[in-house]
Protein backbone atom coordinates (compact mmCIF):
# COMPACT_ATOMS: atom_id res chain seq x y z
CA UNK A 1 0.00 0.00 0.00
CA UNK A 2 1.38 3.42 -0.93
CA UNK A 3 0.07 6.70 0.45
CA UNK A 4 0.36 10.04 -1.27
CA UNK A 5 2.30 11.66 1.53
CA UNK A 6 3.96 9.26 3.92
CA UNK A 7 5.31 5.91 2.89
CA UNK A 8 4.89 2.39 1.76
CA UNK A 9 3.43 1.08 5.00
CA UNK A 10 4.66 -2.44 4.35
CA UNK A 11 8.21 -1.49 5.23
CA UNK A 12 7.58 0.44 8.44
CA UNK A 13 8.35 -2.84 10.24
CA UNK A 14 11.95 -2.62 9.05
CA UNK A 15 13.94 -0.44 11.45
CA UNK A 16 17.37 -1.65 10.37
CA UNK A 17 19.20 1.38 8.99
CA UNK A 18 21.52 -0.63 6.76
CA UNK A 19 18.56 -2.46 5.22
CA UNK A 20 16.76 0.82 4.54
CA UNK A 21 19.86 2.36 2.95
CA UNK A 22 20.16 -0.73 0.79
CA UNK A 23 16.57 -0.09 -0.29
CA UNK A 24 17.75 3.36 -1.34
CA UNK A 25 20.35 1.58 -3.49
CA UNK A 26 17.44 -0.20 -5.21
CA UNK A 27 15.84 3.17 -5.98
CA UNK A 28 13.39 3.50 -3.09
CA UNK A 29 13.04 7.07 -1.86
CA UNK A 30 14.34 6.67 1.68
CA UNK A 31 14.65 9.46 4.25
CA UNK A 32 18.26 8.54 4.91
CA UNK A 33 19.05 10.91 7.78
CA UNK A 34 16.61 9.16 10.10
CA UNK A 35 16.17 6.04 7.94
CA UNK A 36 12.76 5.23 9.39
CA UNK A 37 10.40 5.26 6.43
CA UNK A 38 10.09 5.25 2.68
CA UNK A 39 8.50 8.41 1.38
CA UNK A 40 5.96 8.78 -1.40
CA UNK A 41 7.01 8.87 -5.09
CA UNK A 42 9.23 6.02 -4.02
CA UNK A 43 10.69 4.63 -7.21
CA UNK A 44 9.48 3.38 -10.57
CA UNK A 45 6.63 0.90 -10.93
CA UNK A 46 9.02 -2.06 -10.75
CA UNK A 47 10.06 -0.81 -7.28
CA UNK A 48 6.43 -1.17 -6.25
CA UNK A 49 6.30 -4.66 -7.78
CA UNK A 50 9.38 -5.74 -5.79
CA UNK A 51 7.75 -4.56 -2.56
CA UNK A 52 4.37 -6.11 -3.37
CA UNK A 53 2.53 -2.78 -3.57
CA UNK A 54 -0.81 -3.94 -5.01
CA UNK A 55 -2.82 -0.86 -4.04
CA UNK A 56 -2.09 2.87 -4.11
CA UNK A 57 -4.31 5.13 -2.00
CA UNK A 58 -3.75 8.79 -2.79
CA UNK A 59 -5.37 12.21 -3.00
CA UNK A 60 -3.77 12.64 -6.43
CA UNK A 61 -5.35 11.65 -9.73
CA UNK A 62 -2.93 9.17 -11.28
CA UNK A 63 -3.73 9.96 -14.89
CA UNK A 64 -2.01 11.75 -17.79
CA UNK A 65 1.51 12.77 -16.65
CA UNK A 66 0.98 11.15 -13.23
CA UNK A 67 -0.12 7.73 -14.52
CA UNK A 68 1.82 4.78 -13.12
CA UNK A 69 1.96 1.81 -15.47
CA UNK A 70 -0.60 -0.95 -14.80
CA UNK A 71 -2.31 0.79 -11.85
CA UNK A 72 -6.03 1.09 -12.65
CA UNK A 73 -8.55 3.33 -10.91
CA UNK A 74 -10.96 1.37 -8.67
CA UNK A 75 -12.96 4.12 -6.98
CA UNK A 76 -12.83 6.53 -4.06
CA UNK A 77 -12.87 6.24 -0.29
CA UNK A 78 -13.69 9.66 1.09
CA UNK A 79 -11.18 12.06 -0.41
CA UNK A 80 -8.78 9.29 -1.46
CA UNK A 81 -8.49 7.63 -4.88
CA UNK A 82 -7.82 3.88 -4.94
CA UNK A 83 -5.70 2.23 -7.65
CA UNK A 84 -4.92 -1.46 -8.11
CA UNK A 85 -2.42 -3.47 -10.14
CA UNK A 86 -1.97 -7.15 -11.02
CA UNK A 87 1.72 -6.63 -11.82
CA UNK A 88 3.31 -7.36 -8.46
CA UNK A 89 5.83 -10.14 -8.06
CA UNK A 90 4.58 -13.14 -6.06
CA UNK A 91 5.21 -13.21 -2.31
CA UNK A 92 8.07 -15.63 -3.01
CA UNK A 93 9.88 -15.84 -6.37
CA UNK A 94 12.97 -17.56 -7.76
CA UNK A 95 16.08 -15.74 -9.05
CA UNK A 96 19.42 -17.16 -10.15
CA UNK A 97 21.64 -14.43 -8.67
CA UNK A 98 21.80 -12.00 -5.75
CA UNK A 99 22.47 -8.30 -6.34
CA UNK A 100 24.32 -6.70 -3.42
CA UNK A 101 24.62 -2.93 -2.91
CA UNK A 102 27.34 -1.20 -0.94
CA UNK A 103 26.72 -1.51 2.80
CA UNK A 104 28.12 1.75 4.15
CA UNK A 105 27.05 2.94 7.60
CA UNK A 106 26.74 6.59 6.61
CA UNK A 107 23.39 8.23 5.79
CA UNK A 108 25.07 10.86 3.58
CA UNK A 109 27.27 8.72 1.38
CA UNK A 110 27.17 9.30 -2.36
CA UNK A 111 25.51 6.50 -4.29
CA UNK A 112 27.90 4.81 -6.74
CA UNK A 113 25.84 1.72 -7.62
CA UNK A 114 23.26 2.46 -10.28
CA UNK A 115 19.80 1.48 -8.95
CA UNK A 116 18.43 1.05 -12.48
CA UNK A 117 21.20 -1.42 -13.28
CA UNK A 118 20.45 -3.31 -10.06
CA UNK A 119 16.78 -3.54 -11.04
CA UNK A 120 17.74 -4.63 -14.55
CA UNK A 121 19.96 -7.40 -13.14
CA UNK A 122 17.15 -8.59 -10.85
CA UNK A 123 14.83 -8.86 -13.86
CA UNK A 124 17.50 -10.75 -15.81
CA UNK A 125 17.92 -13.18 -12.91
CA UNK A 126 14.15 -13.81 -12.77
CA UNK A 127 14.02 -15.00 -16.38
CA UNK A 128 17.65 -16.16 -16.59
CA UNK A 129 18.07 -13.81 -19.55
CA UNK A 130 20.87 -11.63 -20.97
CA UNK A 131 18.45 -9.12 -22.49
CA UNK A 132 17.88 -5.68 -20.98
CA UNK A 133 14.56 -4.69 -19.41
CA UNK A 134 15.66 -1.20 -18.37
CA UNK A 135 18.03 0.89 -20.48
CA UNK A 136 19.82 4.23 -20.39
CA UNK A 137 18.10 7.00 -22.34
CA UNK A 138 21.54 7.64 -23.92
CA UNK A 139 21.31 4.33 -25.82
CA UNK A 140 21.39 5.42 -29.48
CA UNK A 141 20.53 1.90 -30.65
CA UNK A 142 17.37 1.74 -28.55
CA UNK A 143 14.34 -0.03 -30.01
CA UNK A 144 11.96 1.35 -27.39
CA UNK A 145 12.60 5.13 -27.47
CA UNK A 146 13.82 7.94 -29.72
CA UNK A 147 15.34 10.84 -27.80
CA UNK A 148 16.88 14.20 -28.57
CA UNK A 149 18.85 16.07 -25.91
CA UNK A 150 19.64 19.80 -25.84
CA UNK A 151 21.75 21.58 -23.20
CA UNK A 152 21.63 25.34 -22.64
CA UNK A 153 23.83 27.16 -20.10
CA UNK A 154 22.35 30.31 -18.54
CA UNK A 155 23.86 32.68 -15.98
CA UNK A 156 22.85 30.48 -13.04
CA UNK A 157 22.07 26.99 -14.30
CA UNK A 158 22.07 24.37 -17.00
CA UNK A 159 18.83 23.54 -18.80
CA UNK A 160 18.75 19.98 -20.17
CA UNK A 161 15.76 19.37 -22.45
CA UNK A 162 14.68 15.98 -23.79
CA UNK A 163 12.27 15.48 -26.69
CA UNK A 164 11.27 11.81 -26.80
CA UNK A 165 9.05 9.46 -28.77
CA UNK A 166 7.96 6.07 -27.43
CA UNK A 167 8.56 3.18 -29.84
CA UNK A 168 6.93 0.80 -27.36
CA UNK A 169 5.00 1.14 -24.09
CA UNK A 170 7.58 2.65 -21.74
CA UNK A 171 8.09 4.45 -18.44
CA UNK A 172 10.84 7.07 -18.09
CA UNK A 173 12.39 7.61 -14.65
CA UNK A 174 15.04 9.78 -13.05
CA UNK A 175 17.58 9.24 -10.27
CA UNK A 176 19.92 11.87 -8.86
CA UNK A 177 21.58 12.75 -5.57
CA UNK A 178 22.05 16.38 -6.57
CA UNK A 179 19.64 19.31 -6.29
CA UNK A 180 17.64 19.79 -9.47
CA UNK A 181 14.26 20.79 -10.83
CA UNK A 182 12.09 18.86 -13.28
CA UNK A 183 9.65 20.34 -15.79
CA UNK A 184 7.06 18.17 -17.55
CA UNK A 185 5.79 19.76 -20.76
CA UNK A 186 6.90 23.21 -19.50
CA UNK A 187 5.24 22.86 -16.07
CA UNK A 188 7.43 22.46 -12.97
CA UNK A 189 6.83 19.09 -11.31
CA UNK A 190 9.01 19.28 -8.23
CA UNK A 191 12.16 20.99 -7.03
CA UNK A 192 15.19 20.53 -4.82
CA UNK A 193 15.57 16.76 -4.74
CA UNK A 194 18.24 16.48 -2.09
CA UNK A 195 20.60 13.78 -0.86
CA UNK A 196 18.87 12.96 2.44
CA UNK A 197 15.53 12.23 0.79
CA UNK A 198 15.90 11.00 -2.72
CA UNK A 199 15.50 8.01 -4.99
CA UNK A 200 14.03 7.10 -8.35
CA UNK A 201 11.20 9.38 -9.50
CA UNK A 202 8.95 8.57 -12.44
CA UNK A 203 8.93 11.24 -15.14
CA UNK A 204 6.20 9.84 -17.39
CA UNK A 205 4.53 6.68 -18.67
CA UNK A 206 4.08 6.64 -22.47
CA UNK A 207 2.26 4.39 -24.91
CA UNK A 208 3.70 3.49 -28.30
CA UNK A 209 3.77 6.50 -30.64
CA UNK A 210 3.39 9.16 -27.92
CA UNK A 211 5.78 12.13 -27.91
CA UNK A 212 6.81 14.04 -24.82
CA UNK A 213 9.09 16.85 -23.65
CA UNK A 214 10.69 17.25 -20.24
CA UNK A 215 13.41 19.49 -18.89
CA UNK A 216 15.85 19.28 -15.98
CA UNK A 217 17.55 22.36 -14.56
CA UNK A 218 20.53 22.30 -12.23
CA UNK A 219 22.81 24.94 -10.76
CA UNK A 220 26.07 25.37 -12.65
CA UNK A 221 28.34 24.38 -9.75
CA UNK A 222 26.34 21.20 -9.09
CA UNK A 223 26.25 20.18 -12.74
CA UNK A 224 29.96 20.85 -13.29
CA UNK A 225 30.83 18.90 -10.15
CA UNK A 226 29.06 15.66 -11.09
CA UNK A 227 26.56 15.72 -13.96
CA UNK A 228 27.01 11.96 -14.49
CA UNK A 229 24.99 11.42 -11.33
CA UNK A 230 21.79 12.45 -13.15
CA UNK A 231 20.55 9.09 -14.38
CA UNK A 232 17.57 8.85 -16.75
CA UNK A 233 16.46 5.34 -17.69
CA UNK A 234 13.65 3.80 -19.71
CA UNK A 235 11.60 0.80 -18.56
CA UNK A 236 10.31 -1.60 -21.21
CA UNK A 237 6.90 -2.05 -19.59
CA UNK A 238 5.62 -5.07 -21.52
CA UNK A 239 8.94 -6.91 -21.18
CA UNK A 240 9.01 -6.36 -17.41
CA UNK A 241 5.38 -7.49 -17.27
CA UNK A 242 6.38 -10.77 -18.94
CA UNK A 243 9.17 -11.31 -16.39
CA UNK A 244 6.69 -10.83 -13.54
CA UNK A 245 4.26 -13.28 -15.19
CA UNK A 246 7.12 -15.79 -15.54
CA UNK A 247 7.82 -15.49 -11.79
CA UNK A 248 4.15 -16.16 -11.04
CA UNK A 249 4.09 -19.27 -13.24
CA UNK A 250 7.19 -20.71 -11.53
CA UNK A 251 5.60 -20.27 -8.10
CA UNK A 252 2.73 -22.72 -8.52
CA UNK A 253 2.35 -23.40 -4.79
CA UNK A 254 0.79 -20.80 -2.53
CA UNK A 255 2.66 -19.39 0.45
CA UNK A 256 1.04 -20.29 3.78
CA UNK A 257 1.28 -17.56 6.40
CA UNK A 258 0.98 -18.35 10.11
CA UNK A 259 1.25 -16.18 13.21
CA UNK A 260 5.04 -16.35 13.22
CA UNK A 261 5.74 -18.80 10.38
CA UNK A 262 5.87 -18.84 6.58
CA UNK A 263 5.63 -22.13 4.66
CA UNK A 264 6.02 -22.96 0.98
CA UNK A 265 6.79 -26.06 -1.08
CA UNK A 266 8.64 -25.21 -4.27
CA UNK A 267 10.62 -27.13 -6.88
CA UNK A 268 13.80 -25.84 -8.49
CA UNK A 269 15.54 -27.34 -11.52
CA UNK A 270 18.85 -25.76 -10.46
CA UNK A 271 20.48 -24.22 -7.42
CA UNK A 272 18.90 -20.78 -7.09
CA UNK A 273 17.54 -18.29 -4.57
CA UNK A 274 13.99 -17.88 -3.31
CA UNK A 275 13.26 -14.24 -2.50
CA UNK A 276 10.42 -13.26 -0.16
CA UNK A 277 8.70 -9.87 -0.04
CA UNK A 278 9.79 -9.64 3.60
CA UNK A 279 12.37 -7.12 4.86
CA UNK A 280 15.56 -8.93 5.89
CA UNK A 281 15.84 -9.48 9.63
CA UNK A 282 18.30 -11.71 11.51
CA UNK A 283 15.44 -12.94 13.70
CA UNK A 284 14.24 -15.29 10.94
CA UNK A 285 15.13 -19.02 11.07
CA UNK A 286 14.71 -21.40 8.13
CA UNK A 287 14.57 -25.10 7.33
CA UNK A 288 14.51 -26.92 3.98
CA UNK A 289 13.07 -30.44 4.04
CA UNK A 290 13.37 -30.37 7.84
CA UNK A 291 17.07 -29.41 7.86
CA UNK A 292 18.33 -26.05 9.12
CA UNK A 293 19.56 -23.67 6.44
CA UNK A 294 20.96 -20.15 6.38
CA UNK A 295 18.83 -17.13 5.57
CA UNK A 296 20.20 -14.83 2.87
CA UNK A 297 19.93 -11.05 2.46
CA UNK A 298 18.59 -10.74 -1.09
CA UNK A 299 19.35 -7.60 -3.10
CA UNK A 300 20.45 -5.93 0.11
CA UNK A 301 16.95 -5.65 1.56
CA UNK A 302 14.78 -8.77 1.29
CA UNK A 303 14.69 -12.14 3.02
CA UNK A 304 15.87 -15.09 0.94
CA UNK A 305 16.79 -18.79 0.99
CA UNK A 306 19.28 -20.65 -1.18
CA UNK A 307 17.33 -23.46 -2.86
CA UNK A 308 18.51 -26.99 -3.48
CA UNK A 309 18.01 -28.73 -6.80
CA UNK A 310 14.73 -30.64 -6.62
CA UNK A 311 11.89 -30.28 -4.12
CA UNK A 312 12.21 -27.71 -1.32
CA UNK A 313 9.79 -27.82 1.59
CA UNK A 314 10.55 -24.53 3.32
CA UNK A 315 9.54 -23.29 6.74
CA UNK A 316 10.44 -19.86 8.07
CA UNK A 317 10.03 -19.06 11.76
CA UNK A 318 10.42 -15.63 13.28
CA UNK A 319 12.04 -15.18 16.68
CA UNK A 320 12.43 -11.50 17.66
CA UNK A 321 15.99 -10.37 18.15
CA UNK A 322 17.11 -10.47 21.80
CA UNK A 323 14.12 -12.69 22.63
CA UNK A 324 16.36 -15.46 23.99
CA UNK A 325 18.40 -12.99 26.05
CA UNK A 326 15.22 -11.41 27.40
CA UNK A 327 13.77 -14.83 28.21
CA UNK A 328 17.00 -15.84 29.98
CA UNK A 329 17.08 -12.60 31.99
CA UNK A 330 13.42 -13.10 32.92
CA UNK A 331 14.17 -16.67 34.06
CA UNK A 332 17.15 -15.52 36.12
CA UNK A 333 15.01 -12.76 37.67
CA UNK A 334 12.31 -15.29 38.62
CA UNK A 335 14.93 -17.63 40.13
CA UNK A 336 16.49 -14.77 42.13
CA UNK A 337 13.03 -13.73 43.32
CA UNK A 338 12.24 -17.29 44.42
CA UNK A 339 15.57 -17.51 46.28
CA UNK A 340 14.83 -14.22 48.06
CA UNK A 341 11.34 -15.43 49.02
CA UNK A 342 12.80 -18.71 50.38
CA UNK A 343 15.44 -16.83 52.38
CA UNK A 344 12.83 -14.47 53.80
CA UNK A 345 10.65 -17.43 54.85
CA UNK A 346 13.62 -19.11 56.55
CA UNK A 347 14.35 -15.89 58.44
CA UNK A 348 10.71 -15.70 59.55
CA UNK A 349 10.79 -19.31 60.79
CA UNK A 350 13.99 -18.72 62.75
CA UNK A 351 12.49 -15.69 64.45
PLM features per residue range, with description:
Residues 1, 68, 93-96, 276-277, ...:
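Short conserved micro-motifs at the rims of enzyme active sites and ligand-binding pockets
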Residues 1-49, 89, 94-127, 190-194, ...:
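Extracytoplasmic/lumenal acceptor-recognition loop(s) of multi-pass membrane glycoenzymes
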Residues 7, 67-105, 310:
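C-terminal, active-site-flanking charged/polar segments
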Residues 28-76:
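Periplasmic/luminal catalytic loop of GT-C fold multi-pass membrane glycosyltransferases
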Residues 52, 79, 282:
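Residues that flank catalytic or metal-binding motifs in active/ligand-binding sites
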Residues 62-63, 88-90, 281, 321:
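Short, solvent-exposed loop/turn segments at secondary-structure junctions
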Amino acid sequence: MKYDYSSIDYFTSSRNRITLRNMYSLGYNVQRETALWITSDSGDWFNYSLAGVKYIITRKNLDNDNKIYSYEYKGKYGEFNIYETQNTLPYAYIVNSNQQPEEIDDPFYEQTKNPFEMQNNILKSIQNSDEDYIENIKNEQSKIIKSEKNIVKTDKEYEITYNVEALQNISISLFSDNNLELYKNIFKDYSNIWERETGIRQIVNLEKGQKYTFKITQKIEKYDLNNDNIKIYVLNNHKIEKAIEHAKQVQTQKVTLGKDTVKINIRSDNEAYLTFQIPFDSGWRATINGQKTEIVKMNGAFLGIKLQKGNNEIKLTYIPRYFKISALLSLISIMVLLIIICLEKRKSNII
